[in-house]
Every structure is written in structure tokens, then in C-alpha cells.
Design a protein with these regions (language model features):
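Short polybasic linear motifs
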Residues: 4-17
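Long, charge-patterned amphipathic alpha-helical coiled-coil/hairpin "stalk" segments used as oligomerization
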Residues: 134-175, 185
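Flexible glycine-rich surface loops and low-complexity tracts that mediate binding to linear polymers
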Residues: 1
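Short, glycine/charged-enriched secondary-structure capping and boundary segments
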Residues: 47, 86-88, 147-151, 177-180, ...
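Conserved acidic residues
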Residues: 69, 131, 160-161, 180
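Terminal alpha-helical anchor/extension segments at protein ends
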Residues: 19-21
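RNA substrate-binding interface of SAM-dependent RNA methyltransferases
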Residues: 24-138, 202-214
Length: 216
């Protein structure tokens, strides 16, 4: 259960019902990153994937919903980062900022960087400590960690966590092996196990930072 001595309570109410025991601020900050290089294609070749408009928008919206401290869009090609910056500026300060102010808010936590290393270094500069780095995969590894254990860390410890999501056919094996943990696969009720990255991000954020509905 939740240890009230280790939590910072938000004191929120919904529909007149006190839900403090389910809606709280975890001690450890959570960061996420969308990786576009080094990525594998279906032939196991190392490639760079393109940034998509949907990935920027939808993951930014999920991030602010689940109180993610920063969402890194990680791309090694300057032209792609410039394209993403142009899209974001439309919603942050252009016509989109007045047409849809909610979208402007969603982009406040998005940062474009050229490598995973820069994302890690940025967090270390902000937090004063190197983050725990985790990623996701449809397979299990020796360093696979459950969502329950990672959520427990976020709720009870202070060291920040960076969860990286791959595009294409996933990050290279060498890159995956350099991380601290790999979150367990997302298992649905059926046999199919090929979610879009946007779906995976939303599911995982809800598991790590969502309302503890099982305590109702």
C-alpha cells in the first residue's frame, strides 16, 4: 500500500469525493524519450526513422496528463529536429497557440535532443543525479523489471527515471543492453502483440503513474 510518510499529497477531490489515497505526487520524477536512432528495420539493419506529427502531439498530451517532467524527442538529423521544432512552434507561439491553447500547454514539456546521451545528461543537470534508464520490448531479458516494481520506485525513491521508447522495429541490441532495466512486455488478452508506440506510451504511463484504480 501507499506509505503516507513517503508521499507528497495533492489534496485533490473529484465529484466531491476525497481521492487523496489514489491521486498523489510520486517522489521520483519521470522522464520519457522517443528514440529515432539507432533503430532496426525489418531486415535488422540500423536506420534512422522519421519524426511523425502524431508522435509529437499524442505523446506530448499523454506526458502532461501523467505529470511527466520532460518528453525528449531524440533524433540525430538536424533537419528532422528543425521540422519538429517548426511543428511545435506553430502550437506554442503561432496561430495554433490561440486556436487550441490546450495543445500549447502539452508542448511545454517537450525537448528536442540529438542523442540518448544528451537526454541523460540533461536530466542529470536538472536533478543532480544520473537517472535510472529503462526501455520497453516485446521480449523478456535478464534485467526485465515489472511495472509494479518500477511504480514502487517512483512512489518511494527520489532517483529520477527515464523510460525510452523505440520507433521502427526497435532499438539495436547493443543500445538495449546499455540500459539499467527493460520493462516487461505489455500483454493483452489476445495473441496480437504489436502496438503502436503511441499506444504503448499511454499504457505504460498509466501503469506507472495512473490512478490506483485497484484500491477503489
Amino acid at each position: 500500500g501507499i506509505n503516507p510518510n513517503r508521499m507528497e499529497w495533492n489534496g485533490m477531490e473529484r465529484n466531491g469525493m476525497d481521492i487523496d489515497y489514489r491521486r498523489y505526487k510520486a517522489l521520483a520524477n519521470l522522464y520519457i524519450g522517443l528514440v529515432h536512432y539507432p533503430i532496426m528495420n525489418k531486415h535488422k539493419e540500423v536506420i534512422t526513422t522519421a519524426i511523425t506529427n502524431y508522435d509529437i502531439h499524442d505523446i506530448a498530451r499523454a506526458s502532461i496528463t501523467y505529470d511527466v517532467s520532460k518528453y525528449f524527442v531524440i533524433h540525430n538529423i538536424p533537419a528532422q529536429r528543425e521540422l519538429a521544432a517548426t511543428i511545435m512552434e506553430h502550437w506554442k507561439s503561432g496561430f495554433g497557440s490561440t486556436y487550441n491553447p490546450d495543445r500549447k500547454d502539452a508542448f511545454t514539456g517537450v525537448e528536442l535532443v540529438n542523442s540518448i546521451a544528451v537526454a541523460v545528461r540533461t536530466i542529470e543537470e536538472l536533478e543532480g543525479v544520473k537517472p535510472i534508464v529503462a526501455t520497453t520490448d516485446a521480449r523478456t531479458y535478464d534485467n526485465t523489471i515489472s511495472y509494479a516494481r518500477m511504480r514502487e520506485h517512483l512512489e518511494n525513491e527520489t532517483r529520477p527515471v527515464l523510460v525510452l521508447f523505440g520507433t521502427g522495429y526497435g532499438m539495436t541490441k547493443e543500445t538495449m543492453e546499455s540500459f539499467d532495466y527493460i520493462l516487461e512486455p505489455i500483454y493483452g488478452h489476445g495473441e496480437y502483440n504489436h502496438l503502436s508506440v503511441r499506444s504503448a506510451v499511454s499504457i505504460i504511463l498509466d501503469r506507472l503513474r495512473g490512478e490506483a484504480w485497484w484500491n477503489k
